[in-house]
Each structure stands twice: as structure tokens, then as C-alpha cells.
């Protein structure tokens, strides 16, 4: 695991374990937590090893959605308990398959990639920065874009988590400041509604 991704996994592991204990104690079921990773696989090179797309970018942009609805749960074939590394790899797999530098695939087999958040929101931002900023003013510069979410939890379906779950997340899994410190994005963009609390960031 590469440097930044390892730092993220080390950040998530103890916090997720503590949050999971709280959720289990209350009988609350959630989907997989949304954990970032920036080591991608390109051209079937064998594993998620390339962080250079992010670290070498001249402009690093982190784009926030509200919450990851229908974020899948990684499956363990051998019965070993799922760890934060597995959740990070889940993100890296999605990104490796769907993020193409200047755009997200809109015709991917992954249902999340067909979401308007990517096809219109995220792709629109990338296109605007490329067409009106980089191509015109800084043609020799390269941008990289990273998807994040204000809330890291989902219960599946089309609805967000309850107030109780948000409060537990804020208390035990408040990781966005550390994510920003580790990844050092130059720009933060929020594609969220006005009802989202500022306490998460």
C-alpha cells in the first residue's frame, strides 16, 4: 500500500472499529463506510499502486457529495473479518474503473457511475475547469479530482442515515479534517444542499 493510502487506512482503522462497536451495541446496520484511497490501478498493472495521478497533479481538487447511497459492502471469500484496507480498496476499485482523468465514465456497468452526481455534477466541474481555466490559462498544467462525501455512512436505498447515526459518526468517525491534512487538496468543492451541517468538515 502506498504512502498516502496507508496513512488514510491507519486513520480509518481505529475510528471505524470504535464506531462499529457503537453501532453494533445499538443494533444499527449500515453499508460499508466510505473510505478514501488514492492508489489506483491503470492498464492492468497488477494492484492498486499508482498514487502519482494525485501527488504529481498541479491542481488537486476534492469534490464533496452529501453521502454515499448504495455504497456496496466488500465481500471476504475466506471468512476473514473485513478491515479498513478492504473499504479503502473498494473505493480504489471504483475509481480505477470509472475515473479517466478528465471525466467519469457515464456508460460504466457500475450503477454509481451513472448517477447524476457524476454524469452532470462532477463531469461538469471537470469540464469547466479544463475548458475555461487550464486549457486557456495554464495549458501545461494537470488537474486531479477526488470524490469525497460529507457523511461516510449509508443504510442503503435512496435515503440517508438518521440523525442518531449522524451523531455517532460525528463523535467517533470525524475524519474529514485529517483526510484534508493527508491529501492536501488545493480546492474543495461542495455539491451539497444547504441542510448539510458544517460540523462534519
Model-derived regions, located:
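A polyanion-binding, active-site-adjacent surface
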Residues: 2-183, 187
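Redox-cofactor binding/interface segments in oxidoreductases and associated redox assembly factors
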Residues: 190
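Flexible loop residues that form catalytic
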Residues: 193
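Conserved small/polar residues in nucleotide/adenosyl-binding loops
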Residues: 199-201
Amino acid at each position: 500500500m502506498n504512502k498516502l493510502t496507508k496513512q488514510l487506512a491507519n486513520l480509518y482503522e481505529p475510528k471505524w472499529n470504535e464506531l462499529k462497536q457503537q453501532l453494533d451495541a445499538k443494533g444499527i446496520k449500515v453499508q460499508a463506510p466510505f473510505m478514501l484511497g488514492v492508489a489506483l490501478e491503470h492498464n492492468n498493472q497488477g494492484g492498486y499502486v499508482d498514487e502519482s495521478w494525485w501527488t504529481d497533479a498541479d491542481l488537486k481538487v476534492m469534490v464533496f457529495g452529501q453521502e454515499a447511497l448504495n455504497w456496496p459492502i466488500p465481500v471476504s471469500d475466506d471468512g476473514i473479518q473485513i478491515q479498513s484496507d478492504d473499504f479503502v480498496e473498494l473505493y480504489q476499485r471504483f475509481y480505477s474503473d470509472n475515473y479517466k482523468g478528465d471525466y467519469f465514465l457515464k456508460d460504466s456497468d457500475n450503477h454509481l457511475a451513472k448517477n447524476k452526481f457524476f454524469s452532470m455534477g462532477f463531469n461538469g466541474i471537470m469540464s469547466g475547469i479544463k475548458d475555461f481555466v487550464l486549457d486557456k490559462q495554464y495549458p501545461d498544467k494537470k488537474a486531479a479530482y477526488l470524490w469525497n462525501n460529507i457523511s461516510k455512512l449509508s443504510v442503503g436505498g435512496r435515503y440517508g442515515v438518521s440523525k442518531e447515526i449522524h451523531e455517532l459518526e460525528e463523535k467517533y468517525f470525524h475524519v474529514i479534517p485529517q483526510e484534508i491534512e493527508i491529501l492536501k487538496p488545493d480546492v474543495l468543492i461542495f455539491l451539497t444542499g444547504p441542510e448539510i451541517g458544517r460540523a462534519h468538515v
